[in-house]
């Protein structure tokens, strides 16, 4: 399959939509390529298991990774994996038909986690937490079976910011979603290639590509209200204060432990009058110089010249 076949949507676009699509896809490719390079997500010879749920994010992740594979200076394999959790009404034909058209290797893993969740969680309660744990266990098992070296999940920038706010407001921790981590069982490396991608752009991309979306509410579970509240708050901030969300994500990549309060991250006890000024000293009450948040780009990245081969859109 050629890059042009991978790129163009299956339905006809107007000239304006086509221009919009090309610009958007180029930006998503650049952002995914930058995340891969910055966190060393994919290496030569990797077998990447792309977890495909049937939602907009995982479809977009698969699409962009397939494009990058065509132009990357390294070789890596992609295997799409979907977990059929036996939810009532799940359209089992959609993903196989879509993946057959792409001509990509894939596996449909059938595991009745839905039945377990319904048995364990009282009616009307949110099932997402238990469902997520069961799903991870099945996917880790699948990754081991197919020999995957990386597991790719479709969480994006907005998911990461929401998780940070959730943990701050409800968990008392400054903790978000890492772009790269070791799996719960200690056997796999999990990556989030969409870490630098905005949800709004993924929605737009999905609409232009006309992905065959499978709804995520087939289980009948109520949404996580805390996360929904955080999402609404962030959306309001985005509307009222343009650039605030971008600034928040930049802050997540620019942490100054000496100016927080965690003694595990910084040795406050050893500070004395001979320690010198640390990271600017006490500027808590000085007026902060506000700079317009910059969109993710290569110009402020260290070793930018080394990343271009991975990120370059050909």
From Swiss-Prot:
Q: Which GO terms describe its cellular component?
A: cytoplasm
Its localization reads:
Cytoplasm
Where is the major localization of this protein?
cytoplasm
Q: Which cofactor does it need?
A: Mg(2+); [4Fe-4S] cluster
Q: What EC designation does it have?
A: 2.8.1.-
* Pathway entry: tRNA modification
Q: What's the record's note on cofactor binding?
A: Binds 1 [4Fe-4S] cluster per subunit. The cluster is chelated by three Cys residues, the fourth Fe has a free coordination site that may bind a sulfur atom transferred from the persulfide of IscS.
- What SUPFAM superfamilies does its record include? Adenine nucleotide alpha hydrolases-like
Q: Name one GO biological process term.
A: tRNA thio-modification
Looking up CDD domains in the UniProt record yields: TtcA-like
Query: What keywords appear on the UniProt entry?
Result: 4Fe-4S, ATP-binding, Cytoplasm, Iron, Iron-sulfur, Magnesium, Metal-binding, Nucleotide-binding, RNA-binding, Transferase, tRNA processing, tRNA-binding
Q: What else is known?
A: The thiolation reaction likely consists of two steps: a first activation step by ATP to form an adenylated intermediate of the target base of tRNA, and a second nucleophilic substitution step of the sulfur (S) atom supplied by the hydrosulfide attached to the Fe-S cluster.
| Task performed by this protein | Catalyzes the ATP-dependent 2-thiolation of cytidine in position 32 of tRNA, to form 2-thiocytidine (s(2)C32). The sulfur atoms are provided by the cysteine/cysteine desulfurase (IscS) system.
Its name, as the record gives it, is tRNA-cytidine(32) 2-sulfurtransferase
Its organism's taxonomic lineage begins at:
Bacteria, Pseudomonadati, Pseudomonadota, Gammaproteobacteria, Alteromonadales
């Amino acid at each position: 399959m050629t890059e042009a076949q991978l790129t163009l949507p299956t339905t006809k676009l107007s000239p304006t939509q086509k221009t919009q699509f090309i610009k958007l896809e180029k930006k998503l490719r650049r952002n995914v390529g930058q995340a891969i390079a910055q966190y060393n997500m994919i290496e030569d010879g990797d077998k990447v298991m792309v977890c495909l749920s049937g939602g907009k994010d995982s479809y977009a992740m698969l699409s962009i990774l397939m494009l990058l594979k065509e132009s990357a200076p390294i070789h890596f394999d992609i295997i799409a994996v979907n977990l059929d959790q036996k939810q009532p009404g799940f359209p089992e034909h959609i993903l196989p038909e879509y993946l057959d058209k792409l001509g990509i290797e894939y596996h449909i893993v059938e595991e009745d986690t839905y039945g377990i969740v319904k048995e364990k969680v009282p009616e009307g309660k949110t099932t997402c937490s238990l469902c997520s744990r069961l799903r991870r266990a099945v996917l880790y098992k699948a990754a081991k079976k197919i020999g995957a070296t990386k597991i790719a999940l479709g969480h994006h920038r907005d998911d990461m910011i929401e998780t940070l706010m959730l943990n701050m407001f409800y968990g008392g921790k400054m903790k978000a979603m890492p772009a790269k981590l070791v799996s719960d069982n200690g056997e796999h490396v999990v990556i989030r290639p969409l870490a630098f991608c905005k949800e709004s752009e993924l929605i737009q991309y999905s609409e232009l590509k006309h992905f065959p979306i499978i709804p995520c509410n087939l289980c009948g579970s109520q949404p996580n209200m805390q996360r929904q509240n955080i999402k609404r708050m962030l959306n309001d901030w985005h509307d009222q204060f343009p650039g605030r969300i971008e600034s928040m994500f930049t802050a997540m990549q620019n942490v100054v432990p000496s100016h927080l309060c965690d003694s595990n991250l910084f040795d406050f006890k050893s500070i004395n009058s001979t320690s010198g000024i640390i990271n600017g000293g006490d500027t808590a009450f000085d007026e902060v110089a506000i700079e317009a948040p910059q969109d993710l780009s290569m110009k402020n990245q260290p070793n930018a010249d080394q990343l271009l081969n991975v990120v370059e859109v050909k």
